[in-house]
Amino acid sequence: MTALYIDADACPVKSEAERVATRHRVKMYIVSNGGLRPSQNPLVETVIVPDGPDVADMWIADRCGTGDVVVTGDIPLAAKCIEAGALVLKHNGEALTSANIGNVLASRDLMADLRAADPFRQGGGKSFGKADRSRFLDGLERTLRKAATLG
């Protein structure tokens, strides 16, 4: 049976994911190391993991599998989940797959190296807007339908 795993650290689409999961009657796990208000929705389980590097990521990676959906902005976690057979979405609705995760990992590493080489470089990512939420909702809807055929 399909499950939806949310890497909740800095996730801007938790409430949107909950709405879609509820509509599909899919169990949803919101995984974090704390600071979240638990949902009253019986389909949503808030999982609080101990503090530590990548503990939430490991919890998700250890449990997800074929037919599950993972929402994360963490590219190494996405790679592990894809390897386990899960379908993965970024917060903006972009699907990460076995076909594109290698390039995404390489780009991530390159950008980390560039930032390390120039610590005075200012700037950040673009803000998360209404269009991003809309793309996420559409992407999650399609991905959950696809997952239902796999799991």
From Swiss-Prot:
Organism domain of life: Bacteria
Name of the molecule in the record: UPF0178 protein RD1_0321
PANTHER family according to UniProt: UPF0178 PROTEIN YAII
Cysteines engaged in disulfide bonds, as pairs: none
Protein family: Belongs to the UPF0178 family.
InterPro entries in UniProt: UPF0178
Record-linked NCBIfam families: PRK00124.1 (NF001095)
